[in-house]
């Protein structure tokens, strides 16, 4: 019987430059691809602010919709679940008889705590994380972590001097491993959240690639040091963190 793997999506809502998907595409397994929407994202926090406002929610839904369609083309299914992530994933692991869970490696305190709790609840499951949310992986750096510069400029100078080649993973032109469950849980539909007409910034891989091409095809990078601290102006920031 083939291994049953759950891929927990977080900030990696793309099929290109996704080492996890590229590796899964070459293996033999049954695959469950899951994204969990946390209701706390849309609630006021201690400062009466919501982590996700209307525009960020629209950006997220656009990204999920585009990924959903891309996965369908590769023979897979995106399952969008809702609830507290650890509880939702613990239940999903039990229901789908998951042997292994894969996800991006995060440096955030809350994300690391969630993963630690999930490991404690599911000791029989193998957990694997991959660095794919950063420009460089730890193995690329020309120094050990205990020698990591304390500020950006010394870091940049060391990295520039090392001339580290950047390679992107490419999803093979084949179907992904078969889905554990074919019918999507809560499929993303075309609605006001996925409508592109009124959005200043659009979510999804295609929009990101278009933005990168537009940004680097002109003179904007050459003026970045001048404009990076501006509080207004669409072209004054890279928007690479979006």
Give residue ranges: language-model regions.
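Catalytic cores of enzymes that engage adenine nucleotides and/or redox cofactors via long glycine-rich
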Residues: 164-242
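Trp/Phe/Arg-rich N-terminal binding region typifying the photolyase-homology
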Residues: 1-167
């Amino acid at each position: 019987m083939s291994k049953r793997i759950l891929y927990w999506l977080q900030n990696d809502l793309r099929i290109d430059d996704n080492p996890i998907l590229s590796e899964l595409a070459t293996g033999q397994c049954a695959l469950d691809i899951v994204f969990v929407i946390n209701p706390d994202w849309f609630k006021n926090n201690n400062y009466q602010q919501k982590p996700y406002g209307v525009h960020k929610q629209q950006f997220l839904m656009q990204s999920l919709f585009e990924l959903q369609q891309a996965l369908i083309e590769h023979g897979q299914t995106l399952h969008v679940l809702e609830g507290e992530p650890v509880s939702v994933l613990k239940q999903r692991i039990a229901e789908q008889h998951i042997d292994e869970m894969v996800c991006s490696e995060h440096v955030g305190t809350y994300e690391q705590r969630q993963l630690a709790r999930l490991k404690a609840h599911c000791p029989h499951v193998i957990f694997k994380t991959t660095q794919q949310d950063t420009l460089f992986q730890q193995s690329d750096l020309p120094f050990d972590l205990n020698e990591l510069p304390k500020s950006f400029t010394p870091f940049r100078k060391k990295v520039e001097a090392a001339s580290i080649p950047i390679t992107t993973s490419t999803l093979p032109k084949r179907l992904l491993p078969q889905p554990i469950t074919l019918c999507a849980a809560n499929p993303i539909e075309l609605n006001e959240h996925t409508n592109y007409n009124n959005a200043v910034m659009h979510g999804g891989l295609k929009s990101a690639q278009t933005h990168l091409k537009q940004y680097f095809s002109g003179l904007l990078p050459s003026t970045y040091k001048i404009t990076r601290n501006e509080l207004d102006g669409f072209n004054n920031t890279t928007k690479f963190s979006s």
